[in-house]
Amino acid sequence: MERTRQRERESNNLFVFSDTISKEAHTSEVFESLLNYSNAETNKPWYHYHNMIDIFKRSHYETFWLEKQIIDQRGITQNLFSNRSKNLYYILGNYGAYDEELAKFYSKNVQSRLKSKNFIVFHLIGSHSWYADRFPKSFAKFKPNDLDFSNLHASSDRDKQIVTDYVNSLYYNDAVLNEIFNLFKDKDAIVFYLSDHAQDMFESGPTYGHRCSKAGLEIPFMIYVSDIFKEKHPEKVKLVKNALNKPFMSDDLIHSLLPLVGIHTKDEVESKNLFSPKFDAQRKRIVCWGSMDYDKIK
């Protein structure tokens, strides 16, 4: 929730990045380069590149993946990554419809299995449509009359209700993130959160949902650090603070996350490391299968 997020900002536990995008607008396409060394400029098939899960395992981390999305034929790509984890859990409808079940399942079934070093993925449903199904009724805080639609192509009552449901799903998502952050507040822990893609909510035209547009690519990206992590790793916290306003594309995540936690490989490129002084802030962010230069449409 915004109040919770504001408190975290004020206590310097939560760092919110201002200029992050995905290179595509669909989960499966984003996953082709989110957790491995493939990116928008590489030429080999994405599955030829080393992936983050295997690298963490080789670095003696216990790996966990908690999955809330139903995997169908459109989710084969992320399924291939999740299956690399040593411990894979599907927390689907039989556990409850909402993302809060991930935190509950973790507390009950995973926490006791942690080792000295752990890499844990929580894959939320988030704000995928249908948006009204993404939050409990108790989180239906906003009504259409509460929102400003003047900059949107939402003209009908139906369109405005869709936008309102989406806003409520974000309100609920903030609460879920707060629950996940709290799971690690007493650990030496750093938590990365980002969306695989965004939703274009009547922003570029009279439609909503997946769209390879400016609005459909702009994603939230934030990092939570526990007090213990801050105390033990002040130099890493400083690197995070210094990167908050740099232009970033999520296909470079592996080049940034691994070095920050002390893992280095022969495939890393320092100019792609968001937290390095040598980060290339002039990189052209070519998106949507090479069809668009994002920064030229800003």
Model region roles, listed by residue range:
Residues 71, 182-186, 199-201, 209-212, ...:
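Membrane-interface soluble catalytic domains
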Residues 39, 125-127, 197-198, 226-228:
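Solvent-exposed coil/turn segments that connect beta secondary-structure elements
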Residues 1-148, 218, 249-250, 255-276, ...:
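Active-site-proximal alpha/beta segments of enzymes that process anionic O-linked groups
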Residues 1, 169-209, 257-258:
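Metal-dependent active-site segment of extracytoplasmic phospho-/sulfohydrolases and closely related
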Residues 219-227:
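Catalytic lobes of large eukaryotic enzymes
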Residues 65-67, 119-126, 167-170, 190-195, ...:
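Short beta-strand segments
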